Amino acid sequence: MVKFSYREQNGGREVMAKYERPEYTVLLSEEPFELREYRDFYIVEYDNAADPGVDSGFGTLFRYISKDNQADRKISMTVPVIQELSEDRMKMAFVVPKAEWEDIPQPNSPSLTVKKFDSGLFAVIQYGGYSNDRKEQDMLEKLAQWVQEKKYQPASNYMLASFNAPFVPPMFRHNEIM
């Protein structure tokens, strides 16, 4: 994994945060689009099929990295938080830090699963500001058009990758549709 950093102004003082993110190589860049080749990485995924009354799995995932796992071990936060964009169910995932790959703690929650995210090619569009349904749909349509123009074939549902905590101001936010 590579280190990703962002800077923000907070009451006049600069705050620096560093998080791991999956490793990838940019094969093609046509701003705001990129074609990336990701290396294998692991995720802990929340799927609301096991708990359909819950809208978001963020709390369940956060508890997992905060020691609610079978090893009772705290796990570092990483970026991005990944959400699968699907109409019939909600899936959200945290990326597992590379230091944990040899012994990934199993979740206590039946809504969570550890999965290997196999290497592969991903078309990506990057955008800033707060993300919402309308903006995500607009970005998804732009990405789908770019993918079609390049004559690529999507092999999975699109995903939203969020890189910032909710309190980060819009001008410093980074989001991606993959």
Predicted regions and their residues:
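A solvent-exposed interaction/effector surface
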Residues: V2-M178
